[in-house]
Curated annotation (Swiss-Prot):
May function in nuclear protein import as nuclear transport receptor. This is Ran-binding protein 6. It comes from Mus musculus. HEAT repeats lie at residues 219-257, 361-399, 402-440, 444-483, 866-905, 908-946, 949-987. Keywords: Acetylation, Cytoplasm, Nucleus, Protein transport, Repeat, Transport. The keyword tRNA-binding does not apply. Transmembrane segments: none annotated. It is found in: Cytoplasm; Nucleus. SUPFAM superfamilies: ARM repeat (SSF48371). InterPro entries: ARM-like (IPR011989), ARM-type_fold (IPR016024), HEAT (IPR000357), Importin_beta (IPR040122), Importin_rep_4 (IPR041653), Importin_rep_6 (IPR041389). Belongs to the importin beta family.
Amino acid sequence: MAAAGSAGLPATVSEKQEFYQLLKNLINPSCMVRRQAEEVYENIPGLCKTTFLLDAVRNRRAGYEVRQMAAALLRRLLSSGFEEVYPNLPPEVQRDVKIELILAVKLETHASMRKKLCDIFAVLARNLIDESGTNHWPEGLKFLIDSIHSKNVVLWEVALHVFWHFPGIFGNQDRHDLDIIKRLLDQCIQDQEHPAIRTLSARAAATFVLANENNIALFKDFADLLPGILQAVNDSCYQDDDSVLESLVEIADTVPKYLGPYLEDTLQLSLKLCGDSRLSNLQRQLALEVIVTLSETATPMLKKHTNIIAQAVPHILAMMVDLQDDDDWVNADEMEEDDFDSNAVAAESALDRLACGLGGKVVLPMTKEHIMQMLQSPDWKCRHAGLMALSAIGEGCHQQMEPILDETVNSVLLFLQDPHPRVRAAACTTLGQMATDFAPSFQKKFHEIVITALLRTMENQGNQRVQSHAASALVIFIEDCPKSLLILYLENMVKSLHSILVIKLQELIRNGTKLALEQLVTTIASVADAIEESFIPYYDIFMPSLKHVVELAVQKELKLLRGKTIECISHVGLAVGKEKFMQDASNVMQLLLKTQSDLNNMEDDDPQTSYMVSAWARMCKILGKDFEQYLPLVIEPLIKTASAKPDVALLDTQDVENMSDDDGWQFVNLGDQQSFGIKTSGLEAKATACQMLVYYAKELREGFVEYTEQVVKMMVPLLKFYFHDNVRVAAAEAMPFLLECARIRGSEYLSQMWQFICDPLIKAIGTEPDTDVLSEIMNSFAKSIEVMGDGCLNDEHLEELGGILKAKLEGHFKNQELRQVKRQEENYDQQVEMSLQDEDECDVYILTKVSDILHSLFSTYKEKILPWFEQLLPLIVNLICSSRPWPDRQWGLCIFDDIIEHCSPTSFKYVEYFRWPMLLNMRDNNPEVRQAAAYGLGVMAQFGGDDYRSLCSEAVPLLVKVIKCANSKTKKNVIATENCISAIGKILKFKPNCVNVDEVLPHWLSWLPLHEDKEEAIQTLNFLCDLIESNHPVVIGPNNSNLPKIISIIAEGKINETISHEDPCAKRLANVVRQIQTSEELWLECTSQLDDEQQEALHELLSFA
């Protein structure tokens, strides 16, 4: 179509007609016509689009569908395209747009079109408020205020709709604005004559409160609107409108404190609606959601209303009984996903969350009797619901259920024999969930009865759905079951699994049924993964059948089976090891290559993809360097998957509603009626592909070198891929391994790659919002420094890093202060304390990563980094103050330990900061703190120089006192104690003039060997070798009396795997043993005091050293 004339001039009649025809073509049923119209529309200049669309919206003769399309396009233009279009309109056109829009809203008679015009009005208003909150459309605001003061109900509706769409329209709200807003909402929410007005005002009030979620004072001011909102919730539900109820759920989730003054009323209303079977399932679920959400977001408040929770429990359980008599369930060959819209699934989830939110002390007494009654019911639906309720409350009621776990488990096991298959399946699900919730004590206590019962259920060929549930439960049980316990049942388990595999393979060939077989191969993989080399005797009976499944599963509907079986084969191969697997390796690799070739020509969401990716990684681990020949075939699709960009969109709420049924999209509400959407399908595959690339770089090194540059260019930008945490984790984890690969090509190539990585990695430490991801990024940075070595950071990098670490430490202290404030609040209780402790653990974990980064800097830069470090010194000193929590003191001491170890003798300049904390913390109640202090005292002796002599002298009595403490060797204390023993050894070795060596040595020898701390153990053995090789009389003892003790120390060192083949100390110790063997009498005296295991350990030591 022709472009319109000059700015501000009206378009010609023919141009208008062309544009109207274009709008009609945009809604034409023909795809080709629509596509052509879209291309024409995209090429129309913004000025012309704006004027044409506004004219079409106002033209009542254009037809409703055309006007509707024009309204949608204009809203989109002023929303997502505002910055490109509106500022470039001439001032007079901007003025005309605003005037015309007010007139259009004011004069529109069609209710639906008026709402669309209000949406456009709100979008424009939102974009005409700047960052400071100034409204640049005062005429629009005046129109709204005039509408509020008018007696025209239609204009009230206009004002409410705009305000609901954009609650920030008043900009910087002063007292006068708040009074206007409250008057508008109050007068409309009380309107008994117009239900639509009352509903809309309640939604607008909720949206306004949500938009001001941090303004606690406003909550009090607007609290008297709550009765009207609750009344509107009730009334609208019975008019088949759940929009206000949805708003109430949002308030419960985001601003629960607003509900405080009327919490009882809110809960009573929710309880009433939840229990009313006349309402739709969705409405009842939403009403329940209000209660459940408050249990999570306002736990202390809700615990004051347990009477209402107790009344809600029967409603929840009744909803869980709402199941269909589905004859197809028994014969289904697909494991359908849970229907989250069903009452049963929604209620089960609600009970789970309620238990976790309020805890077992509250929930278990309310549910136990109801559940027991349901389990005794003749109705299979009640028995099913009772079992699923037990499954749901386990996590939240963990502590309270443990004492009754025996009777609970025995009760559940009985239902594996229930006449109804769905009850048997529910019993399997419940056992699986308990195995998760109560692990590992559940496995240790019930291994015999649970494994036996699940195997028996799997062997029952009556129903493959039940078999599949039993096999799934067994997988979950195995995950946390000690290997030593699984071995007890291995023979029976393998026999059972193999016989079922043979039957299911025949069923696949004969009938094409696959459901139980899909789960069975996963169970076999789980068993092999758990028992590792113990699977070798059974390898030959499973592998032929597994390969046969892969060969058979070629049809489209068998792709998932094929993928899971490939995964199983790779798990089995990894379990039995390269030597055993090599007989099938070539054949298996050909099967994988065939599948890989097929995948390259298949859809992105093919279910085999994720299984293939992880299977290749396991094959790499099995084959080692032999895998390099296959890497070119694997790497291309892997990089393609890892590089895939997700579809994203910024949409108005109305557009989201139109897309809500679209597969694979998830939306986050950004407020102001805007949502950010991302198509999630493919994100998991992308994360898995990234993790596999990390794995290949780590395992193959030289074999991965040629892909290093391509992968690093892809991975570095993914440090900012905020759509999926595991993608960022993989990107961070990859960096040190990619640097190791780059090093193979020489220092210049390595330096160039580090320049590309370093800056984004540092920035990611400063900007990453997720604690778990942040810890991985910090860990990666620390490892990268160690790879690159001294001088790898320039002044700009060090300055930025210093600022970031300083901010992390300051944030750490600030968060601790805030937690102390919360402990003084009225609502503080055990549940709040648990939440605060979780927060504290996250903060401490980041503190450990700060320590890791500083460790890397100290170990690579040595004393040259100390001038930079001094900006952090006051914060580190603050960590070791006696008033700080013990983890702070532990990690503060660890940082000073690193300074002493790597920056001495210069470290002595800081001695007054850490001298007394180091000595005093030797008496701390927490072994972690004692360990850090003891290690520091040891490295003072080893690396500190003469300046530390007096401090080492002071340390010895404190170290001895810890070692001699009655409970020093308990599991909790042993690591700290062994660090004390090692520290004394270091003082004896490196600062002998600080102590009476001959007096202390006999005690030190009596404390050996060290069992738990392998690093310190090998240091003590090296010192022992020094003493023996120098024939130190105190160590050798009169008439060689100490040699039996020394021989036992050496034997224990081998048994504890302290002594390894590679360690030079092994040869020294072996020579000591051989020297003693030269005297037959002495040797017999030494070995007579050893048990068989110790003698075997000595024999093994002599054979390799």
